[in-house]
Amino acid sequence: MKLSIADFEEWLRERGYDLMMGEQNFRLYLDLGFSALLFYNSNLLFSFILDKVGLKSADERVPDRLRFEIAKRLRRIEATKDEIEIELL
């Protein structure tokens, strides 16, 4: 599965994060890119990824147990600033 930063931006806007953060902070957050957000362990990024693999969480905070279950199925993950590619078993 390949996801782009544009997909992530749209997902965040649909949930009102652009309004909560303010446009300038929202842009700064997105400008970090996927690789930095992955390293930072961003809950929003993990919620986005889980949503895209069909595991929606009622809360934006992803429980550690759910992260662990996904991690067990993770075969490969590659992140650049503008794109993330995930391969599950």
Swiss-Prot record:
Cellular compartment(s): Membrane
GO CC, any one term: membrane
Keywords: Membrane, Transmembrane, Transmembrane helix
Principal place of residence: membrane
Membrane topology: Single-pass membrane protein
Domain of life: Archaea
Protein name: Uncharacterized protein AF_0752
Membrane-spanning parts: 28-50
